[in-house]
Amino acid sequence: MADERYNRKNPAVKRILQEVKEMQANPSDDFMSLPLEENIFEWQFAIRGPGDTEFEGGIYHGRIQLPADYPFKPPSFMLLTPNGRFETNTKICLSISNYHPEHWQPSWSVRTALVALIAFMPTSPNGALGSVDYPKDERRTLAIKSRETPPKYGSPERQKIIDEIHQYILSKATVVPKPLPLECSQAPSIVSEAHSQVEPQEAITVVEERSIATTDTIVDDQIIEETAEAVNTAASVVPAAAPLPAVEVVVKASVSGEQRMARRAAQKPVDDRLFTWAAVGLTIAIMVLLLKKFIKSNGYSTGFMDDQS
């Protein structure tokens, strides 16, 4: 790099050149970033997808634009590789980016920002600007594809840096991502099998409940009819190879009906019996009065008295 092009007394230039040397002296296996020769405020970078996520093994290229008063103001970031977490060719909104200068600290560097960017990859976007939220299987597909070729972007000089960075990260990203297992697509079939196995028993339960509910509202001669109907319903729902549940329905329905009616008889109010006895007594009294009136009207009482005298 031709350092003589820039004023080394400029705080921003001095800081950028210092970070370049530090980056070259202490390279990372997780990222690589280099400034352009013609503009040290413009950087190219690539990061590895974080491990144990759908991004693992992916290589994601992007660009960094440093402000003229760096490091007192934050840089802006843009992803060039489709990734399913951030939009491409769009400045992304992060707490370390120029969208939130209030969070930026001058002690942070390009290295700090790239480490933070890797950490942001598997987080929820929450509607932030420049963010997308692809399903995990699509993100894994993009991670696999990202290893094939680096993105084509900018001038030949920039493309040369992009290719160099890609080869470096590819040599470090030894874990080749594989498509995620199709757990979601297999789940419905598994659930369907389980559901088909449970359906007969569930149907029996429905028949039992309907039979019991019906016996609560009918008399003794109707219980037999409802029980027979329950048997027919169970026979149509339950496979022929499982006759026992249908028999069990009949027994349960009949026994339950008898038990419920017995409970009702036991719970009959005592007041009903008292009213019955009172009615009987009243009827007898009325009959006695009517008999006396009849005897009196026919003179039986007078003749009886004359005989005594």
Swiss-Prot record:
<dbReference type="GO" id="GO:0048471">
    <property type="term" value="C:perinuclear region of cytoplasm"/>
</dbReference>
<keyword id="KW-1133">Transmembrane helix</keyword>
<dbReference type="GO" id="GO:0042631">
    <property type="term" value="P:cellular response to water deprivation"/>
</dbReference>
<comment type="pathway">
    <text>Protein modification; protein ubiquitination.</text>
</comment>
<dbReference type="GO" id="GO:0006511">
    <property type="term" value="P:ubiquitin-dependent protein catabolic process"/>
</dbReference>
<dbReference type="Pfam" id="PF00179">
    <property type="entry name" value="UQ_con"/>
</dbReference>
<dbReference type="GO" id="GO:0016567">
    <property type="term" value="P:protein ubiquitination"/>
</dbReference>
<feature type="active site" description="Glycyl thioester intermediate">
    <location>
        <position position="93"/>
    </location>
</feature>
<feature type="domain" description="UBC core">
    <location>
        <begin position="11"/>
        <end position="166"/>
    </location>
</feature>
<dbReference type="GO" id="GO:1902457">
    <property type="term" value="P:negative regulation of stomatal opening"/>
</dbReference>
<keyword id="KW-0808">Transferase</keyword>
<dbReference type="GO" id="GO:0004842">
    <property type="term" value="F:ubiquitin-protein transferase activity"/>
</dbReference>
<dbReference type="InterPro" id="IPR000608">
    <property type="entry name" value="UBQ-conjugat_E2_core"/>
</dbReference>
<dbReference type="GO" id="GO:0061631">
    <property type="term" value="F:ubiquitin conjugating enzyme activity"/>
</dbReference>
<comment type="similarity">
    <text>Belongs to the ubiquitin-conjugating enzyme family.</text>
</comment>
<keyword id="KW-0067">ATP-binding</keyword>
<protein>
    <recommendedName>
        <fullName>Ubiquitin-conjugating enzyme E2 32</fullName>
        <ecNumber>2.3.2.23</ecNumber>
    </recommendedName>
</protein>
<dbReference type="GO" id="GO:0005524">
    <property type="term" value="F:ATP binding"/>
</dbReference>
<comment type="function">
    <text>Accepts the ubiquitin from the E1 complex and catalyzes its covalent attachment to other proteins.</text>
</comment>
<keyword id="KW-0472">Membrane</keyword>
<dbReference type="GO" id="GO:0005783">
    <property type="term" value="C:endoplasmic reticulum"/>
</dbReference>
<dbReference type="GO" id="GO:0016020">
    <property type="term" value="C:membrane"/>
</dbReference>
<feature type="transmembrane region" description="Helical">
    <location>
        <begin position="275"/>
        <end position="295"/>
    </location>
</feature>
<dbReference type="InterPro" id="IPR016135">
    <property type="entry name" value="UBQ-conjugating_enzyme/RWD"/>
</dbReference>
<dbReference type="InterPro" id="IPR050113">
    <property type="entry name" value="Ub_conjugating_enzyme"/>
</dbReference>
<keyword id="KW-0547">Nucleotide-binding</keyword>
<keyword id="KW-0812">Transmembrane</keyword>
<keyword id="KW-0833">Ubl conjugation pathway</keyword>
